[in-house]
Amino acid sequence: SVVEPIEPVFVDYEKDMKQFKAEGLNVLYVQNKVNDIAKLNYIYDKGTESDPILNLAFNYLSYLGTPTRTAEEIAEEMYQLACSFSLRAGSSSTNIAVNGLDENLPKAMEIVEDLIYNAVPDETILENLKTDMLKSRTDAKLNQSSCFNALQRYVMYGPDFITKTTICNEELKNLTSEELLGTIRNLMECEHEILYY
């Protein structure tokens, strides 16, 4: 039998995607017609180039609980909702994502926002993270490919790039829980875009 050639279908942004404002924020919405899984992304035009401690702050937050939930209870609750979340900062943008069953997304977002705004600091966890990061940096200096990658970044982006996107060891040692959590809370107040699929 002969297979008929497939005709290309071009995206019609007016028909295939809805754009609207919600509480002053741009929202791009595409309905998932395949299954009940939804993805909600908050995209910020701010990354590690403008705030080098973002990823450390996100990493720290992932170990914390709130006054009403421990980190383990948050993980269990998200599991029960069939949802997950991630916080990632790239060099020029940051993405806070919540994925899972569409019907449970509002509850999952509540949990994530509660964690962001009400995280209970834990100095032991912070000190362990700092120690791990300092050890990782020491190990990277002994690794040839890490040194080569740093050299490539230096050549491509210039000498200021590394100092702009990386905090020095002394600054790392002096970071406080309040600074890290404040960085995330301040990010939440920045203008951002919402992608919902």
Give the label of every model feature segment.
Residues 2-20, 153-193:
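Histidine-acidic residue clusters that define the catalytic metal-binding segment
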Residues 120-126, 174-175:
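Peptidyl-prolyl cis-trans isomerase
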Residues 35-62, 66-118, 130-138, 143-171, ...:
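M16 family metallopeptidases and their MPP-like homologs
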Residues 1-2, 7-12, 17-54:
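His/Glu-based metal-binding/catalytic segments typifying zinc-dependent metallopeptidases
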Residues 27-30, 83-87, 181-184:
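Short beta-strand/turn micro-motifs at beta-sheet edges
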Residues 28, 126-129:
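Residue-level marker of intrinsically disordered, low-complexity segments enriched
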